[in-house]
């Protein structure tokens, strides 16, 4: 049944992190914008980002150096054009953030001049990380949220999940294939609403919730990647899942990460006996790229049969540690640990999805009118491994470029007066929610065990067989019962799990974040692993 949509806007932005909100604020002067947030508006990966944002502000640094560092960290398969595009626009986009009211830390130089305090993290050859103490994401997110909520042209819908995108040819509309809106699950009212939009932007973040152990908030369930795939978009490089080397090992704080900046300021990684191991692994020691550090920690844990390794900055002055890492210091103190006095137990945990929906310089996907920006996208910036503090930067740069393109094409986009209403005539209320919980746990455990930091062909094949069975069960459940938040996330996550495994099976080498015992060497030449819904098993 066709009906007038309950919601209508010029631009629907699905996601309320740095990518989505920066885009919304750039567009709102001329266009009506709706921003969807799955939970409270600030509950996303941006809020929890500790490290900072990479940009060239130091006169001894250069854009060329930022580019080169990113290419090296990406292990040979970054898109050089994308890297240069982001690095060359970094300072302008960070300045826009400052103009919005974001306060980065400053310090007084020996010559008496005040400047931004720049820190250094793994993979960077210079100090180029702007930060707000050790809670940069919180400063960025709260500033952008405040501005968005007070803008008359931005409507923020909290506790609202996108169920699926509405694509023109799938609902019988004539003309070129394009996105015309989305169905939205209103968690407060517990029903599905129809939203018309001239442009739709996926800013949903990554898919690290596919793993049992993650530093991400619960909402990181790969929604945008799954929706884009179902809409007909290509995805790429999903085998490259970044495991943050230093998540806190503590039963009461499983999602808490210890920022890379700790190692940037001199923290050591140690075995339980107090000895260091990174100097034996890489000449850069603790400042090696994350894939190398995470694999080294994983190797030591397995070699020693240890539950964790340790991060130690107790050799630095107490005041220095408390001043630079106040949030981490306070959190650990609440848990009975003193960062200034003792080594802190850590383990690797799923942290960032380096692949995603294939886009161009403007965040445009394969479907007309559909954009993807931030962690959900594959721009080519990160290659086989994301360099620290390039993620928030990517959000800002593509939020800027997508805004330009959306604004440019808006006058030529025709509105759609009626869209199909969500049909619940053949479904019933769920009676066995334990099925969802069981599938949740099984999926995340098998991904951790078989598609984790170290992989083999047999593990990947085993994972794919079980994922295929889970997909059948979940699709049947989705077809017969009313939607719920857990069901929507599970449906999306099992789809993304399949895509991760298929990308991993395509790559017959070890490179960056993808390490397989069956192909331990790196090929002389390689490129992205690209999957298309039209030919799902195409090789790169």
From Swiss-Prot:
EC top class named in words: oxidoreductase
Single GO cellular component term: cytoplasm
Gene Ontology biological process terms in this record: 'de novo' NAD biosynthetic process from L-aspartate
UniProt pathway: Cofactor biosynthesis; NAD(+) biosynthesis; iminoaspartate from L-aspartate (oxidase route): step 1/1
Function recorded in the entry: Catalyzes the oxidation of L-aspartate to iminoaspartate, the first step in the de novo biosynthesis of NAD(+).
Family designation: Belongs to the FAD-dependent oxidoreductase 2 family. NadB subfamily.
Annotated site, Important in orienting the L-aspartate substrate, chain positions: 121
UniProt entry tagged with the keyword Cytoplasm: yes
Lineage: Bacteria, Pseudomonadati, Pseudomonadota, Gammaproteobacteria, Enterobacterales
Protein encoded by which gene: nadB
CC cofactor: FAD
Compartments, record wording: Cytoplasm
Catalytic activity: L-aspartate + O2 = iminosuccinate + H2O2
Binding site for FAD: 16-19, 38, 45-52, 223, 375, 391-392
Entry GO MF terms: L-aspartate oxidase activity; nucleotide binding
Protein's name in the database: L-aspartate oxidase
EC assignment: 1.4.3.16
Organism in which the protein naturally occurs: Salmonella typhi
Keyword hit for Oxidoreductase: yes
Keywords: Cytoplasm, FAD, Flavoprotein, Nucleotide-binding, Oxidoreductase, Pyridine nucleotide biosynthesis
């Amino acid at each position: 049944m066709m009906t007038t949509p309950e919601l209508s806007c010029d631009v629907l932005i699905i996601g309320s992190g740095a990518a989505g909100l920066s885009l919304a604020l750039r567009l709102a002067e001329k266009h009506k914008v709706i921003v969807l947030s799955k939970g409270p508006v600030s509950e996303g990966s941006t809020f929890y980002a500790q490290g900072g944002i990479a940009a060239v502000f130091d006169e001894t640094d250069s854009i060329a150096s930022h580019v080169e560092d990113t290419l090296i960290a990406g292990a040979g398969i970054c898109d050089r054009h994308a890297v240069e595009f982001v690095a060359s626009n970094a300072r302008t986009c960070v300045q826009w953030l400052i103009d919005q009211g974001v306060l980065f830390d400053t310090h007084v130089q020996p010559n008496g001049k005040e400047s931004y305090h720049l820190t250094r993290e793994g993979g960077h050859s210079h100090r180029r990380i702007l930060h707000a103490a050790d809670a940069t994401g919180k400063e960025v997110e709260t500033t952008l949220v405040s501005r968005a909520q007070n803008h008359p042209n931005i409507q923020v819908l909290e506790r609202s999940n996108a169920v699926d995108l509405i694509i023109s040819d799938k609902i019988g509309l004539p003309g070129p294939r394009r996105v015309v809106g989305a169905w939205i699950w209103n968690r407060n009212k517990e029903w599905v609403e129809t939203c018309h939009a001239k442009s739709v932007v996926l800013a949903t973040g990554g898919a690290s919730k596919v793993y049992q152990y993650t530093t991400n908030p619960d909402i990181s369930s790969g929604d945008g990647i799954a929706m884009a795939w179902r809409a007909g978009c290509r995805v790429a490089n999903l085998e490259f899942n970044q495991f943050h080397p230093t998540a806190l090992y503590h039963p009461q704080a499983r999602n808490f990460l210890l920022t890379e900046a700790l190692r940037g300021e001199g923290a050591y990684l140690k075995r339980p006996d107090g000895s260091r191991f990174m100097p034996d692994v890489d000449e850069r020691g603790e400042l090696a790229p994350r894939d190398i550090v995470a694999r080294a920690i994983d190797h030591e844990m397995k070699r020693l049969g240890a539950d964790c390794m340790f991060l130690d900055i107790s050799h630095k002055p107490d005041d220095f540690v408390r001043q630079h890492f106040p949030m981490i210091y306070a959190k650990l103190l609440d848990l009975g640990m003193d960062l200034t006095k003792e080594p802190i137990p850590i383990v690797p945990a799923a942290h960032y999805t380096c692949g995603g929906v294939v886009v161009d310089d403007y965040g445009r996907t394969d479907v007309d009118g559909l954009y993807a920006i931030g962690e959900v996208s594959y721009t080519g910036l990160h290659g086989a491994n994301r360099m620290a503090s390039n993620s928030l930067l990517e959000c800002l740069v593509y939020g800027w470029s997508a805004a330009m393109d959306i604004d440019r094409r808006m006058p030529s986009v025709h509105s759609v007066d009626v869209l199909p209403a969500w049909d619940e005539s053949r479904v019933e209320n769920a009676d066995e929610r334990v099925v969802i919980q069981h599938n949740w746990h099984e999926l995340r455990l098998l991904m951790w065990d078989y598609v984790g930091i170290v992989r083999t062909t047999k593990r990947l094949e085993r994972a794919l067989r079980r994922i295929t069975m889970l997909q059948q069960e979940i699709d049947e459940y989705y077809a017969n019962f009313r939607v719920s938040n857990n069901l929507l996330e599970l449906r999306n996550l099992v789809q993304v799990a399949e895509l991760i495994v298929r990308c991993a099976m395509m790559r017959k080498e070890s490179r960056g974040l993808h390490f397989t015992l069956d192909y331990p060497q790196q090929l002389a030449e390689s490129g992205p692993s690209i999957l298309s819904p039209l030919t799902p098993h195409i090789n790169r």
